[in-house]
UniProtKB/Swiss-Prot annotation:
DNA-dependent RNA polymerase catalyzes the transcription of DNA into RNA using the four ribonucleoside triphosphates as substrates. Common component of RNA polymerases I, II and III which synthesize ribosomal RNA precursors, mRNA precursors and many functional non-coding RNAs, and small RNAs, such as 5S rRNA and tRNAs, respectively. Pol II is the central component of the basal RNA polymerase II transcription machinery. Pols are composed of mobile elements that move relative to each other. Keywords: DNA-directed RNA polymerase, Nucleus, Transcription. It comes from the Eukaryota. Disulfide bonds: none annotated. One of its GO terms (molecular function) is DNA binding. NCBIfam families: PRK09570.1 (NF007129). InterPro entries: Arch_Rpo5/euc_Rpb5 (IPR014381), RNA_pol_Rpb5_N (IPR005571), RNA_pol_Rpb5_N_sf (IPR036710), RNA_pol_subH/Rpb5_C (IPR000783), RNA_pol_subH/Rpb5_CS (IPR020608), RPB5-like_sf (IPR035913). Component of the RNA polymerase I (Pol I), RNA polymerase II (Pol II) and RNA polymerase III (Pol III) complexes consisting of at least 13, 12 and 17 subunits, respectively. In RNA Pol II, this subunit is present in 2-fold molar excess over the other subunits. This is DNA-directed RNA polymerases I, II, and III subunit RPABC1. It comes from Caenorhabditis briggsae. The lineage of its organism: Eukaryota, Metazoa, Ecdysozoa, Nematoda, Chromadorea. GO terms for biological process: transcription by RNA polymerase II; transcription elongation by RNA polymerase I; tRNA transcription by RNA polymerase III. It is found in: Nucleus.
């Protein structure tokens, strides 16, 4: 069925972008997962989404951070076209049972206002992020117009501010809702190094504070 073929392709692309995203945040993802071709995805999960092969719940991802295996994160793909508060509660229940405090929710078309509100209410105990499927069809960091972004550690940030005798407030800013900031899961107060090619200097580096 043509619809199944298209939907299988979409789910493969979306899951691939999510795996790249959590890998770029420092979570452990096997190289064969990052490189998984469409055919392998079909063999693993199925190619008939209309018959729940795969069901979106089959695509759930659980990853641990390279620097701290106790820092784990879920990625959920709920079946509901629009996410309501009931789905958020079910997700938090699963996180509580497994003692995991971070998750990304991949949303098909949107969320109800009460679901969005509940995500805010859960923080900081449960840190939930959400992305629309349409946002994950491509990896924005691979776009030729998006320069390389490197997230700085707290130590690197402190060293930068000391070296240039700066305060946080003197750095240029990047909004937390910026697509690249969302991709990296940046939080307010973090600093990101942006590396652009330069015809004269080879490369041109700027720093931005997340606000």
């Amino acid at each position: 069925m043509a619809d199944d073929e298209l939907e299988t392709y979409r789910l493969w692309r979306i899951r691939k972008t999510v795996l790249q995203m959590v890998h770029d945040r420092g979570y452990l993802v096997a190289q064969e997962e990052l490189d998984q071709p469409l055919e392998t995805f079909k063999e693993t999960f199925g190619d008939r989404p209309s018959e729940k092969k795969p069901a979106r719940s089959d695509l759930t991802i659980l990853v641990a951070h390279n620097d701290d295996p106790a820092d784990q994160m879920f990625v959920f793909f709920p079946e509901d076209t629009k996410i309501g508060i009931k789905t958020i509660k079910a997700i938090c229940q699963q996180m509580q049972e497994q003692n995991i405090s971070r998750a990304i929710i991949v949303v098909q078309t949107g969320m109800t206002p009460s679901a969005k509100q509940s995500i805010g209410d859960m923080a900081p105990k449960y840190m939930l992020e959400h992305f629309l499927e349409a946002e994950l069809m491509v990896n924005i960091t691979e776009h030729e117009l998006v320069p390389e972004h490197v997230v700085m550690t707290a130590e690197e940030k402190a060293e930068l501010l000391a070296r240039y005798k700066l305060k946080d407030s003197q750095l240029p800013r990047i909004q937390q809702c910026d697509p690249v900031a969302r991709y990296f899961g940046l939080r307010r107060g973090q600093v990101v190094k942006i590396i652009r090619p330069s015809e004269t200097a080879g490369r041109y580096i700027t720093y931005r504070l997340v606000v």
